[in-house]
Amino acid sequence: RQRQMCIRDSPYRAPKDYRKQALASVTTHDLPPTAGYLNFAHVKLREELHLLSEPVEAFAASAMAERTAMMNRLVENGYISQTVADDVEGHVQEIVEAMHAMLTDTPSLLLQAALVDGVGECRSQNQPGTSREYSNWRVPLADSSGHVVHTDEVFDLPRVQSLAAVMRREKR
């Protein structure tokens, strides 16, 4: 449940509170892609795989509270408008980019953007706690529409280019 941008039990850290000698990222291979996090794909997957140690309603409520805390942080710091925060599903790419923009405002010397966030993938590449229950590391990379993305076309995708511009601080 922990996002890389947060302190273990929330609230989310302000960008200025990150350590300089650190690698900062929005997600990792053990967490859902950010688009999946925003649309609760991780809740559905963990329920399907029977990985929850609490009722799905409680886990879903916790996930909603985490997402709301992140939207509040993004709004408070001017990365998105309240209108965008109120319509997450309609603004996934904008929010993913805003989360990465917030990352670029940290003092951390190393920043990481996940390829899955660049293409808009929602499915987890790895699900900790599974071996045969989930196709870890065998999930084909796909875009937000579910179309497979081949490695030779990744950097031609407008969405990847847009996220790269955010990471280079060219886009705000």
Can you say where each PLM-predicted feature lies in the sequence?
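Short, solvent-exposed loop/turn segments at secondary-structure junctions
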Residues: 8, 30-32, 116-120, 146-147
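Conserved, mostly hydrophobic/aromatic
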Residues: 29, 137
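Short, small-residue-biased leader/transition segments that mark boundaries at the very start
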Residues: 2-7
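Non-catalytic regulatory appendages
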Residues: 16-19
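Hydrophobic faces of well-ordered beta-strands that scaffold small-molecule active sites
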Residues: 1, 24-27, 111-113
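A structural signal for the main folded, soluble domain(s) of proteins
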Residues: 1, 125-130, 144, 166-171
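A glycine-rich beta-turn/hairpin centered on an aromatic-Pro dipeptide
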Residues: 56-113, 119
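Short conserved micro-motifs at the rims of enzyme active sites and ligand-binding pockets
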Residues: 10-14, 34-45, 49, 122-126, ...
